[in-house]
Amino acid sequence: MYTYQTVVRYEDLDAQGRVKIPAILNYLENAAVLNAAAVGYDMDRMAELDLCWVVMCWDVKLGRRIRWNEALTVETWPYQFYGSIGKRGFRILSAQGEVLAEADSW
């Protein structure tokens, strides 16, 4: 499992102060890209190999509202590979370990 820490930024909020769905997806995508880099497949290496990551679908379940300036831990792990296609799980946790979002991508 790969984890990284982030903080909810002002630009991640909508006019009502709620975290925008695209911001949540960005947290998840960043986790996947950072995980790939940690195992030797950063953006430069992927370009050398003429490879890229493509997310075909998201399944996201949201918990309580994520707040501005809240410290988050984002977790990710790959699973169920079929050749070059695989799934990836994600969780976003509060500083207290509360699950704020869960997701799968493929």
Question: Where are the model-predicted features located?
Answer:
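Small beta-barrel nucleic-acid-binding modules, principally OB-folds
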Residues: 51-65
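HotDog/MaoC-like acyl-thioester-processing domains
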Residues: 2, 61-106
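Hot-dog-fold acyl-thioester-processing enzymes
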Residues: 1-55, 102
